[in-house]
Amino acid sequence: MNENLFASFATPTMMGLPIIMLIIMFPSILFPTPKRMITNRVVSVQQWLINMIMKQMMNIHNNKGRTWTLMLISLITFIGTTNLLGLLPHTFTPTTQLSMNLGMAIPLWAGAVVTGFRHKTKASLAHFLPQGTPIPLIPMLIIIQTISLFIQPMALAVRLTANITAGHLLIHLIGGATLALMSISPTTASITFIILILLTILEFAVALIQAYVFTLLVSLYLHDNT
């Protein structure tokens, strides 16, 4: 039975309810971590990697901004894990859904903006009108700055959605081409299979990079408002 090219991006449901959270939480329910494995090498490498990334991100923040450290750690871990799980066969990637990414981007962006207006009201308002702006351009510049401010969460969500979706589509297309060429031209099929393997490796890197970029941009928005 032939499926639509975008069928793999449709949200699976059970009795009319989305099962995204069940898919994400199910492995942790089945395989609880024993106490003796809490400090193993894998966990140590994971902690070292997260600490190194957070140290780079939080160096630019003051004490007020560093209160968001736990939130940013949770964010980069969640997005990275979700992206990697979506590369497994017969799985669904929630971050290909714009609605989910907007659900992450808008609250984080709004929290950073509200923090700025609460603690640095004058500085936040000053962003709408840079110093030295000619008087005739003031109304238009304020409108442009306001629009650019409200576009930030949309840009965050669209960037993540587009990058993850594009990679999955390429894997789907090249994988289908490989299967079709196996009976026609085994040599060409071997070449496309090698390309598929390389693209899959690249997608693992993209999955982690996009999690880092999303969290880094949230961190920069926070820095502008604290």
UniProtKB/Swiss-Prot annotation:
| Cellular location(s) | Mitochondrion inner membrane
Domain of life (superkingdom)? Eukaryota
* Keyword DNA-binding listed: no
Instruction: Give TM segment ranges.
Output: 12-32, 68-88, 97-117, 138-158, 164-184, 189-209
CDD domains xref list: ATP-synt_Fo_a_6 (cd00310)
InterPro entries on file: ATP_synth_F0_asu, ATP_synth_F0_asu_AS, ATP_synth_F0_asu_bact/mt, F0_ATP_A_sf
Its biological purpose is as follows: Subunit a, of the mitochondrial membrane ATP synthase complex (F(1)F(0) ATP synthase or Complex V) that produces ATP from ADP in the presence of a proton gradient across the membrane which is generated by electron transport complexes of the respiratory chain. ATP synthase complex consist of a soluble F(1) head domain - the catalytic core - and a membrane F(1) domain - the membrane proton channel. These two domains are linked by a central stalk rotating inside the F(1) region and a stationary peripheral stalk.
Report quaternary structure and partners.
Answer: Component of the ATP synthase complex composed at least of ATP5F1A/subunit alpha, ATP5F1B/subunit beta, ATP5MC1/subunit c (homooctomer), MT-ATP6/subunit a, MT-ATP8/subunit 8, ATP5ME/subunit e, ATP5MF/subunit f, ATP5MG/subunit g, ATP5MK/subunit k, ATP5MJ/subunit j, ATP5F1C/subunit gamma, ATP5F1D/subunit delta, ATP5F1E/subunit epsilon, ATP5PF/subunit F6, ATP5PB/subunit b, ATP5PD/subunit d, ATP5PO/subunit OSCP.
Name of the protein this chain belongs to: ATP synthase F(0) complex subunit a
Gene name, per UniProt, is MT-ATP6
